[in-house]
């Protein structure tokens, strides 16, 4: 019997439409093989939505996402909209999407493909075999804490402030996602905070340690965020699963992505307690190469694979997509950003055809 799924596509800006087209072709191919029918619906988000409607996330687009089984997002933002007031910029649409769908946990998987190890800035022996999952809290912390803003002081000069705040329930919720994720992987969880100077991080550490009693099979460790950043570069093999707050996770995910040689290699999944999740590459919209067929679609395709696995509970469809990505690289067909000696660089469209 054919299984039907409604997928909302948010292609967004820059290279977004190019890499989304490849991912959709891949989903159609795997759907045909496994009798899965995907009903794709395009919706506006980001700069293209601002140009068309004046809003980075129109209500119509948010409702389309709510009505779907999963949301596949490509990339948003670009130079064109950088000078808009902050509340009107494309990136605010992403925050609104997460809040509107109740997404509180982001999983970003850092997996080193053996065929492109030489593209990494680190030595092969340092990165070979690395497989890290970063679990990041999405709806709290300094991005959402109040009060925040730019205020005029008594001296007549402006002062900017943001508030980093987490409640016990928020920490417990993301902490359990971290422990459950580690339990299904290698059983090691590293909690990243800044408990030596931040009160909010001390509460974070206290709650994570309290949760550990419910997961005796998981080995728990703690690192301050500055040390964690250093350790990711020094010896990434020590990590299995990392759980951390919104700001720290945002920074560490991007830093870790470049260890692969390109930020175009890192997929992510944003999930809530129920309802559709959002699946997207960690990278941005790369407006400098948009429309030139230079974009790396791997993270978008791997995000589609994460959608199949975590959003639609179709691991039998996710597995062949992930294996096919490795196979195309094994054939020696990378995009230019992960090119190594002996390989032949291909464009975004050609890479999709190779798949």
Curated annotation (Swiss-Prot):
<feature type="site" description="Important for catalysis">
    <location>
        <position position="194"/>
    </location>
</feature>
<dbReference type="InterPro" id="IPR024084">
    <property type="entry name" value="IsoPropMal-DH-like_dom"/>
</dbReference>
<dbReference type="GO" id="GO:0003862">
    <property type="term" value="F:3-isopropylmalate dehydrogenase activity"/>
</dbReference>
<feature type="binding site">
    <location>
        <position position="254"/>
    </location>
    <ligand>
        <name>Mg(2+)</name>
    </ligand>
</feature>
<dbReference type="GO" id="GO:0009098">
    <property type="term" value="P:L-leucine biosynthetic process"/>
</dbReference>
<keyword id="KW-0464">Manganese</keyword>
<dbReference type="Pfam" id="PF00180">
    <property type="entry name" value="Iso_dh"/>
</dbReference>
<feature type="binding site">
    <location>
        <begin position="78"/>
        <end position="91"/>
    </location>
    <ligand>
        <name>NAD(+)</name>
    </ligand>
</feature>
<feature type="binding site">
    <location>
        <position position="250"/>
    </location>
    <ligand>
        <name>Mg(2+)</name>
    </ligand>
</feature>
<keyword id="KW-0479">Metal-binding</keyword>
<comment type="similarity">
    <text>Belongs to the isocitrate and isopropylmalate dehydrogenases family. LeuB type 1 subfamily.</text>
</comment>
<protein>
    <recommendedName>
        <fullName>3-isopropylmalate dehydrogenase</fullName>
        <ecNumber>1.1.1.85</ecNumber>
    </recommendedName>
</protein>
<dbReference type="GO" id="GO:0051287">
    <property type="term" value="F:NAD binding"/>
</dbReference>
<feature type="binding site">
    <location>
        <position position="226"/>
    </location>
    <ligand>
        <name>substrate</name>
    </ligand>
</feature>
<feature type="binding site">
    <location>
        <begin position="284"/>
        <end position="296"/>
    </location>
    <ligand>
        <name>NAD(+)</name>
    </ligand>
</feature>
<keyword id="KW-0520">NAD</keyword>
<feature type="site" description="Important for catalysis">
    <location>
        <position position="143"/>
    </location>
</feature>
<dbReference type="GO" id="GO:0000287">
    <property type="term" value="F:magnesium ion binding"/>
</dbReference>
<dbReference type="GO" id="GO:0005829">
    <property type="term" value="C:cytosol"/>
</dbReference>
<comment type="subunit">
    <text>Homodimer.</text>
</comment>
<feature type="binding site">
    <location>
        <position position="226"/>
    </location>
    <ligand>
        <name>Mg(2+)</name>
    </ligand>
</feature>
<feature type="binding site">
    <location>
        <position position="136"/>
    </location>
    <ligand>
        <name>substrate</name>
    </ligand>
</feature>
<keyword id="KW-0963">Cytoplasm</keyword>
<comment type="function">
    <text>Catalyzes the oxidation of 3-carboxy-2-hydroxy-4-methylpentanoate (3-isopropylmalate) to 3-carboxy-4-methyl-2-oxopentanoate. The product decarboxylates to 4-methyl-2 oxopentanoate.</text>
</comment>
<comment type="pathway">
    <text>Amino-acid biosynthesis; L-leucine biosynthesis; L-leucine from 3-methyl-2-oxobutanoate: step 3/4.</text>
</comment>
<keyword id="KW-0560">Oxidoreductase</keyword>
<keyword id="KW-0028">Amino-acid biosynthesis</keyword>
<keyword id="KW-0432">Leucine biosynthesis</keyword>
<keyword id="KW-0460">Magnesium</keyword>
<dbReference type="InterPro" id="IPR019818">
    <property type="entry name" value="IsoCit/isopropylmalate_DH_CS"/>
</dbReference>
<feature type="binding site">
    <location>
        <position position="98"/>
    </location>
    <ligand>
        <name>substrate</name>
    </ligand>
</feature>
<dbReference type="InterPro" id="IPR004429">
    <property type="entry name" value="Isopropylmalate_DH"/>
</dbReference>
<keyword id="KW-0100">Branched-chain amino acid biosynthesis</keyword>
